A protein has these predicted regions:
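Conserved substrate/cofactor phosphate-moiety recognition/catalytic segment
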Residues: 17-59
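The conserved Walker
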Residues: 9
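Small-molecule kinase domains that catalyze NTP-dependent phosphoryl transfer to phosphate-bearing small molecules
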Residues: 96-141
Length: 141
């Protein structure tokens, strides 16, 4: 099974992946992790697309996506989860990640990107108050 968890920075994609992985025992990739597969970036991308395609009906893979450019890597048949959070929650989490300091340019970037996946077609849309049992049920686990 291929599960794509898509969302802005600091919405909880990794936390959700960790919770799901208790049942899935999946290989987890995030963003450009696939570049580690090969020295040549285009060869790495091709290899990663093959891994994702094989995962649709094979070994479990969870792919965490923040950047829209990575959506094109997803094959048909992926179970797509869009994860959202309120802007104030995202800012607080990002501030914590930045050791208590959220520079104004980063804050403006978060504001401009907020809601970028709100209208994206998906199999399951969650906010940060999801119930993991309901999520696993939707996945058929």
């Amino acid at each position: 099974m291929l599960v794509a968890i898509i969302g802005e920075n600091c919405v909880g994609k990794t936390t959700l992946a960790n919770k799901l992985n208790g049942k899935l025992q999946a290989k987890v990739y995030a963003g450009k992790d696939y570049l580690r597969l090969e020295k040549n970036p285009s060869v790495a991308e091709t290899a990663f697309k093959a891994i994702l395609k094989d995962a649709v009906d094979g070994q479990n893979v969870i792919y965490l996506i923040t950047e829209k450019e990575h959506l094109q890597l997803l094959p048909e048949g992926a179970f797509v989860i869009v994860l959202t959070a309120q802007l104030d929650v995202i800012k607080a989490r990002f501030k914590e990640r930045m050791r208590g300091n959220l520079p104004l340019p980063l804050e403006k970037m978060l504001e401009s990107r907020h809601g970028m996946y709100d209208d994206m077609p998906c199999d399951l849309k969650l906010d940060n108050n999801y119930n993991i049992e309901e999520v696993t049920k939707k996945l058929g686990l």
